[in-house]
Amino acid sequence: MADQINMGGLSLNEGGHQGPPQGRSYIPPHMRGRGGPPPAGPQAGGPPVMNGGPPAAAPGPNGIGNSAWANQNYGARQNNWSNDVPTYQGNNNRRGGWGGRGGGYSGGGNFDGHSGGGGAPTARGSGDGQWRDGKHIPGPANPRVERELFGVTAEDPSKQHTGINFEKYDDIPVEASGTDVPEPVHQFTTPPLDEHLCRNIELAHYKVPTPVQKYSIPIVSGGRDLMACAQTGSGKTGGFLFPILSQAFINGPSAVPANAAGQFGRQRKAYPTSLILAPTRELVSQIFDESRKFAYRSWVRPCVVYGGADIGSQLRQIERGCDLLVATPGRLVDLIERGRISLQNIKYLVLDEADRMLDMGFEPQIRRIVEGEDMPQVQDRQTLMFSATFPRDIQMLARDFLKDYIFLSVGRVGSTSENITQKVEYVEDVDKRSVLLDILHSHANGLTLIFVETKRMADSLSDFLINQNFPATSIHGDRTQRERERALEFFRNGRCPILVATAVAARGLDIPHVTHVINYDLPTDVDDYVHRIGRTGRAGNTGIATAFFNRGNRGIVRELMDLLKEANQEVPAFLETIARESSFGGGGRGGRSRGGGGRGGATRDFRKFGGGGFGGNNNGGGGGFNNAGSQGAGFSAGGGGGAGYGGGAGYGGGAGYGGGGYGNPSGPGAQSSWW
């Protein structure tokens, strides 16, 4: 390790590596080898005592851990954690504090319009307009709601949105394939967008459309189906919300079906006209928050439903009106079975992060929603699929859901952005905590997102950071929805600028101002790596992504090298060495193999470049998506002589595609947090 890692002056101990602290206070690299300063009392406004640590006036074992230097170092960090953060309550009381597993942050109050009981957010602030005599009449302005939705100024850190730095990125390559592709737009203007929507876009401080929005707005407004493949952080959410809401404002609500007559009171059924499906609770909540912004003062009432929250509050929200529904597949199936939602009026169907929903075993629910209920047929609706990657097998599946669609590929999708400086460091497992502390001390500003592989590691690492006087919290599937929402909110606003996360937060979340992403544990699939580091460098901004690599990660070494080369990043020599070792040992990709076709088809329209099979040999013998079903034979149903996608007995590694039916998309014993 000593020969391979260069961390800006990091000095190692006599054993050749820097081990965990073992009861000693952490000493930053530039202070090592010096004598400790004399004891000093706490400075005014210094950080609170955390996690039952020693009093602020007492020096650490090396005379440094609680010195004036430590207080000064905190004061230099962005947002000045010490000014307005309540005292952490310690490990003996797991119900509060940044890292407490029992309750997340202990402060009260709600945010983003969410209800206090962990249920669904209300539609407050939207749906105030009317549709009268064939015209859209916006509601009156509400300064309080505007502050909540859009912030006080464009520089408001709690509401500032990425997507405003694309003015200098007009040269981003865009590929649009299909018949009669409309010309892109270059401004948010009327037409093609509705005048009221343009006012809301201005309130949100959007300046110019992002590349994906330039093309998606005229495509969707023209009535075409769309498969959009665009980099994470490129404005995909606005890419489908803008044209859908604009058409709603122009055309008005749909008539209630004749068979809905006589439905009154609490048991009446909702008939949304737009349905947006996404894989995780966090992502649907984020899309809902964005839809509230752009539906402000309009007749459109957005609603959101997801598992893990009180279904009663979600039903009450739907009863107040539901025109645009954002949902996870599992909870939507539940509400359909209860007879509370009908898809009879759907004009727009959006599948966001479509490849992830299929990876997570949601295909049975999606097929039931799209093909097995009362949703209009493919010819009678518009269907939009958005994601950062669309491997060839997912494109083949799109033939069942889309008609005469336009394939849109923006930028070098399926890869990473040059706005992200990627660093890969060789770090053995025993050294990870020590190297992490070095990085956190050397990158003092902005928000840091740390990815780990297990829920236990997320809690353990956040507790460790708190013990080292770093305000940190964790987010993972075992936390309640309310705890996860609080953790994300305090991470967004900078009160808790270090977030340790499992894969539950890896995809889709739009958290502005994340300046550093650290892959403490590398994933086994390079696509997951792409999505993780996509949390920084969003929408033209710059960011840093650091990965801790060792020989345990050799399964993705070749694809990681390809990504680094494609993004014009430095490829460390040790990656070349381990790649050669793997070639002799027969090593290869450790994760899922996307049909053996690598990443070559992830960004191109298979209709142009050919689409024989799903890639590789995994479709031999008549297997594949359509006839694997829930036979327990896996993704390829015996094709290519393998057990299929799940590596065992089915898509989710359980029994058949879902293992556990509609209730748990990943089978018994798997995480239920995804839905």
UniProtKB/Swiss-Prot annotation:
Disulfide bonds: none annotated. Residues 69-89 have a biased composition (Polar residues). It comes from the Eukaryota. It is an enzyme of class 3 (hydrolase). PROSITE patterns: DEAD_ATP_HELICASE, HELICASE_ATP_BIND_1, HELICASE_CTER, Q_MOTIF. Residues 1-143, 582-613 are annotated as: Disordered. Residues 46-68 have a biased composition (Low complexity). GO terms for molecular function: ATP binding; ATP hydrolysis activity; RNA binding; RNA helicase activity; translation initiation factor activity. ATP binds at A230, Q231, T232, G233, S234, G235, K236, T237. Residues 419-579 form the Helicase C-terminal domain. GO terms for cellular component: cytoplasm. The Q motif is unique to and characteristic of the DEAD box family of RNA helicases and controls ATP binding and hydrolysis. This is ATP-dependent RNA helicase DED1. It comes from Gibberella zeae (strain ATCC MYA-4620 / CBS 123657 / FGSC 9075 / NRRL 31084 / PH-1) (Wheat head blight fungus).
